[in-house]
Design a protein with these regions (language model features):
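Small-aliphatic-rich amphipathic alpha-helix that forms the alpha element of a beta-alpha
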Residues: 36, 101, 105-117
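Beta-hairpin (beta-strand-turn-beta-strand) motif
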Residues: 55, 98-102
Length: 117
């Protein structure tokens, strides 16, 4: 537990993203898979999923995001939004997190007493 607390305390967000990384895509994928496997979950249901996007797929995610936000963010405020999206697009890749709702639903059915939680 102490090492986990130390890791959290030492964590810092890197706001300057870029494409220069020291790991290969395969190494990144392996490390992310290992982390996802070990992340605790309620009832150990392991419903968390991750999609890793690199290259053209990464670029497409941020282009779609930018064009979607352009439709809803007021024009006078869009420059700030665009700068933030462009900073994300400058990264080497994108990690998309989601929950597999089929796994969650199955767990709710197996444990109806706790389904609302």
């Amino acid at each position: 537990m102490e090492s986990l607390i130390k890791a959290y305390a030492a964590r810092r967000t890197n706001y300057t993203l870029g494409k220069n990384v020291s790991l290969s895509q395969e190494e990144i994928i392996e490390k992310v898979q290992a982390v996802v496997k070990e992340i605790p979950s309620a009832f150990n249901m392991q419903s968390g999923r991750i999609i890793l996007a690199f290259g053209a797929k990464h670029d497409a995610i941020w282009q779609i995001t930018k064009e979607t936000l352009r439709k809803v963010v007021p024009a006078e405020a869009f420059a700030k939004t665009e700068a933030k999206i462009d900073s994300f697009a400058a990264a080497y890749g994108t990690v998309l997190y989601y929950d597999d709702t089929a796994v969650v639903k199955a767990m709710q059915e197996q444990n109806p007493l706790y389904a609302a939680n």
